Amino acid sequence: MHEFSIVQSLLTLIEDYARENNAKSVTKVVVSIGVLSGVEPHLLEMAFNTFKEGTVAEKAELIMEIEKLKIKCMDCGKESEKEELNMLCPGCGSLNTQIISGQDMFLKSLELEVD
């Protein structure tokens, strides 16, 4: 489960940001998870709830925003948001497409409680 190592890195980032902003706690953590990121949201949530104990994010709520796959066709130029996980252009049927979004995971925002 690579979600554990992802959460450990996420918590390090959260701790650093909280320290830089003199926050006594973090109340909300918002992450964006692309459907092709390889991250399983339920496993990420479980890992977050396990590892946040004893950190500045101990009482934080984790909000996960799932980002759909978005592609651009290199033949016809059409940009498409895909419901299914395939790279076929719905405009011309080409497989000559490029991923625009939906393959990353990143920290989107934090809600901090400061002194």
UniProtKB/Swiss-Prot annotation:
Stored Gene3D superfamilies: 3.30.2320.80
UniProt keyword annotations, A-Z: Metal-binding, Nickel, Zinc
Record has Zinc as a keyword: yes
Residues annotated for Ni(2+) binding in this entry: 2
A GO term for molecular function: nickel cation binding
Biological process annotations from GO: protein maturation; protein modification process
SS bonds (residue pairs): none
Binding site for Zn(2+): 73, 76, 89, 92
Pfam families per the UniProt record, alphabetical: HypA
PROSITE patterns assigned to the protein according to its UniProt record, in alphabetical order: HYPA
Function: Involved in the maturation of [NiFe] hydrogenases. Required for nickel insertion into the metal center of the hydrogenase.
Family from the record: Belongs to the HypA/HybF family.
NCBIfam families, sorted: hypA
Name of the protein: Hydrogenase maturation factor HypA
